[in-house]
Structures are given as C-alpha cells and as structure tokens.
C-alpha cells in the first residue's frame, strides 16, 4: 500500500496559507500562490530592514539641514565644526533636539559658531 503523507502535506500547506492570511484574493487561498507571496514578502522584509537604517539617517540629516539653514549654517559646515570641537552628539539626538527643543539646539549651534575650535597639533614639516 502506498503512503502519501496526507497529514504532513496538509500541515505544511496550512502553515504557508496561515502566513499569507492577510493577503488579498487568491494570494491567501491558493497554496501555490500563497507560498510565492510569503517568499516574496520575506525578501522585501529582509531588504527593507537594511534600507530602514539608511532612510532614517537621511531623514535626520534632512531635518538638521533645515533647522541649521534657519540659523544661517549648512549641515556639512555644522558637522565639521562639531568634530573640530570634539562634540560627540549623534545625528538622531541632534534631529530630535531641533524638533522638540529648538532653544537647546540653538544653544549648541551658537556655541559651535562662536568658539574657535581646539587647535590640532601642527603637521611636521619636511626639515
């Protein structure tokens, strides 16, 4: 007698159909299409978990640049001055400050603008 593995097949198919349960049309009802849908969704999720980091960094930089232009400064100049002053506040925190507490953000900008950066060691000359 041939054993076709009916229970295992049903369990496996139900697993794929359950994962595709939020999909529209035949995507949540047909086993073959549901499986393809779930696999493609996993690919998109994998890709976008990485893109999310890029997107948020771009958003923070965009917000900072907008807030800094109101102060008469650009993002690139500001970041350069922060590094010269050895101020280590990341872009996420600066962006949040610019939105939620503009007065404190303005203090940081004024401090960076007014003070001269700490002099780095001069480069050794050839002789």
Curated annotation (Swiss-Prot):
GO terms for cellular component: ribonucleoprotein complex; ribosome. SUPFAM superfamilies: Ribosomal protein L20. One of its GO terms (biological process) is ribosomal large subunit assembly. Pfam families: Ribosomal_L20 (PF00453). Keywords: Ribonucleoprotein, Ribosomal protein, RNA-binding, rRNA-binding. It comes from the Bacteria. The keyword Cytoplasm does not apply. GO terms for molecular function: rRNA binding; structural constituent of ribosome. NCBIfam families: rplT_bact (TIGR01032). Belongs to the bacterial ribosomal protein bL20 family. Binds directly to 23S ribosomal RNA and is necessary for the in vitro assembly process of the 50S ribosomal subunit. It is not involved in the protein synthesizing functions of that subunit. HAMAP family: Ribosomal_bL20 (MF_00382). PANTHER family: 39S RIBOSOMAL PROTEIN L20. This is Large ribosomal subunit protein bL20.
């Amino acid at each position: 007698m041939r054993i076709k593995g009916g229970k295992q097949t049903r369990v496996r198919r139900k697993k794929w159909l359950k994962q595709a349960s939020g999909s529209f049309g035949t995507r949540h009802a047909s086993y073959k299409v549901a499986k393809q849908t779930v696999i493609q969704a996993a690919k998109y999720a994998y890709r976008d978990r990485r893109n999310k980091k890029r997107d948020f960094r771009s958003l923070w930089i965009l917000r900072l640049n907008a807030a800094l232009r109101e102060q008469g400064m650009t993002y690139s100049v500001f970041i350069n001055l922060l590094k010269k002053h050895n101020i280590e506040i990341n872009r996420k925190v600066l962006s949040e400050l610019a939105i939620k507490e503009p007065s404190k953000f303005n203090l940081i900008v004024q401090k960076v603008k007014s003070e001269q950066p700490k002099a780095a060691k001069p480069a050794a000359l050839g002789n």
